[in-house]
Regions:
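Conserved long alpha-helical elements within nucleotide-processing catalytic cores of c-di-GMP signaling
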Residues: 4-7, 16-35, 42-69, 78-82, ...
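Short catalytic/binding micro-motifs of nucleotide second-messenger systems
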Residues: 69-74, 102-115, 152
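A structural signal for short, well-ordered beta-strand segments
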Residues: 36, 85, 120-124
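Catalytic-core segments of nucleotide cyclases and related cyclic-nucleotide turnover enzymes
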Residues: 53, 97-104, 121, 126-159
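Residues at or immediately flanking beta-strands
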Residues: 76-77, 115-123
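A structural signal for hydrophobic residues in beta-strands of small regulatory alpha/beta folds
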Residues: 88-89, 126
Length: 159
């Protein structure tokens, strides 16, 4: 029981950073292509500061549910930080892109009628697109892409 809890995020029920690291180590041993979708929830601090941490927790939980629905049985979802998640998928680049589209749709649907806005920045990376397709490199690429998306979204809001 305790070993299982060590790999679970209490708030969301998703795998935590330790579970993601364990999966990445297993992926490194495999030759199968894989990809990551990094997800960063926008404005969580603003929700926590204005509406309180219980509302922020509800937002995190809602995004986690969006990720689980989007990944369905094709991928694994992890909460790796306060407002950061990663979805890992094996198979094809097309499956990765389709999952990212489903995440965007799920998050947009969660935003409809919400008392606070729900949006997320996404970054994708596929192992076969990398010169060094090890999990750490693919993760860095997805993380960089997520921050670029976050910057683009902020610029669009300010325009």
């Amino acid at each position: 029981v305790y070993a299982k809890l060590a790999y679970r995020d209490v708030l969301t029920g998703l795998g935590n950073r330790a579970a993601f690291v364990r999966e990445a180590q297993e992926t490194k041993q495999s030759a199968a292509p894989f990809g990551y979708i990094m997800v960063d929830v926008n404005d969580l601090k603003k929700v926590n500061d204005t509406l309180g941490h219980p509302k922020g927790d509800a937002l995190i939980h809602r995004v986690a549910q969006c990720l689980q629905r989007a990944a369905a049985e094709k991928g694994n979802c992890y909460r790796i930080g306060g407002d950061e998640f990663v979805v890992s998928l094996n198979g094809s680049r097309e499956a990765l892109l389709a999952c990212a589209d489903r995440i965007r749709e799920e998050v947009a649907a969660a935003d409809a009628g919400s008392e606070f806005p729900v949006s997320a920045a996404l970054g994708l990376a596929w192992s076969e697109d990398q010169p060094d397709p090890i999990p750490a490199q693919v993760f860095r690429q997805a993380d960089d892409a997520m921050y670029a998306d976050k910057k683009r979204m902020k610029a669009n809001r300010e325009a």
